[in-house]
Amino acid sequence: MAEEKNEGLVLLDFWVSPFGQRCRIALAEKGIPYEYSEQELLGAKSDLLLRSNPVHKKIPVLLHDGRPVSESLIILNYLDEAFRPDPAVSSSRNKLLLPSDPYAGAQARFWAAYSDKVYELGTRLWKLKGEARAQARAELLQVLTHLDGQLGDREFFGGEEFGFVDVAIVPFVPWLPSYERYGEFSVDEAAPRLAAWARRCAGRESVAGSLHPPEKVDEFITMLKKHYGIE
């Protein structure tokens, strides 16, 4: 049997996954070429995925010369470490996503990890009803308020440059209209600065090329509800 070739970068991903989209946006921002490998999540998972992430059996997984790196935020951090900027190259893509200052970097990691709650609580909105949904709504609004406050009046979470926290949060934006509908709230009202930030980010090439329209996300949620037998 011929030996399997594992050279360069391969991203094991699923088209609508916001966690995989974090990796796609980061790769685009840094101008790093890679191969995309679409994975099946609702059916039988590929042997490659199971071998690459035997613990969680989830995407995204980044294969670098055949060696797997799992979990989206760990992948983002890895890309910064493995593909450091070249001082001799002047390019907007020749950049670090994380701040070089240790404290600023720690804060960025905190807020990026905290943003996972948007997806977690949003999922509870469309899965649950009644009091449980109301609780998820209240918690999600609190998370959005915290993110809005952390952003403040800055253009991006790191200041003037699109960076680590922006990459972590922006893939959740196409999911927000569905969350608004199930939770009966408005992001524009609850977190106006965050809503304005989302509109600014939408025009970035890396973001526009990685995310899907909210309508496609809503169709996917509807499909998931049918798959799990949720009325």
Segments (PLM) and residue ranges:
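Phosphate-coordinating loops and pocket residues in cytosolic domains that bind phosphorylated ligands
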Residues: 51, 203, 212
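GST-like domain detector, emphasizing the conserved glutathione-binding G-site
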Residues: 1-157, 161, 227-228
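Short, flexible loop/turn segments with low-complexity composition
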Residues: 91-97, 209-218
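Acidic/histidine-enriched, glycine/proline-rich intrinsically disordered or flexible terminal extensions
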Residues: 213-231
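Charge-dense, low-complexity polyampholytic segments
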Residues: 126-130, 186, 220
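GST superfamily/GST-like fold recognition
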Residues: 159-182, 186, 190-196
